[in-house]
Amino acid sequence: VWWNMHEAKSRIDKLKAEQPNAPAFVCELQGGWFSTVGGRLSEDSYLDGRHARGMALMAMAGGSTGLNYYMFFGGTHFAGWGARRMTTTYDYGAPLKENGGVGEKYAAVKGIGEVVDKFGGLLVRSRPVRFDVQGADNLTIGIRRAADGTLFVFLLNRDKKQAFRQLVNLTVEGKPMRIDCQLAALDSKLLVVHAGTDMVEWYPREQTLPERPVALPLPITIADVWRKDEDFRGDWIPLRKGKSLPELGVNDCRYSMYRSQVNLT
């Protein structure tokens, strides 16, 4: 649902309605995309930290108690690929990149991790709260209350271009509530109203990324290079159009070569 992040909430709402006593898990919380042969790399996808943050917060707003990013750590499968037309790289635009690097998406997921660390015990047993809202046409809002009375207000700006900066008037369980909402385009936040106090906090907080190492390793000097020319001797199997290697009983793509004959006129 990365193209419509607010649906993460509505879909979890539906699951909870169908199975109210069952936990709701998101096993593949989309946060990136694969790369294709001749196409764009994962890092060129527009899916960024806003999507990683928004989908997680909207899933929690719906009552999800299990989150698993797909993918959190990118990697490469040198023995083959995931599907036809895909590259062997599976960086997937993951928060922790294929080469071990991190960026703004990692910071976004780290911020979600802080929310879970601080409030996970309250959120998993929280209940949805009925509310009315005015002046928030481009917002998706979800409100939950923990057993101790702590209120969690989830907000997502669905507008892809315009920021949302205005007061939001809510009626929560019959009581008025006003929120000064400042959200960039496609951004999301969580307002925590602590029970029995006037204390409110905004999450996720800004995160600090690890510092890049100063003492870099020395470059590697290649002393010897070996070259092997293929002689193209092998068990050649006709491959009809539309057929894949597994359909021919070939399940190891590492050493497969292709040849074709072209008749010129």
Question: Where are the predicted features?
Answer:
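Carbohydrate-binding surfaces of carbohydrate-active enzymes
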Residues: 17-43, 47-265
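Alpha-helical scaffolding within the catalytic cores
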Residues: 5-15, 54
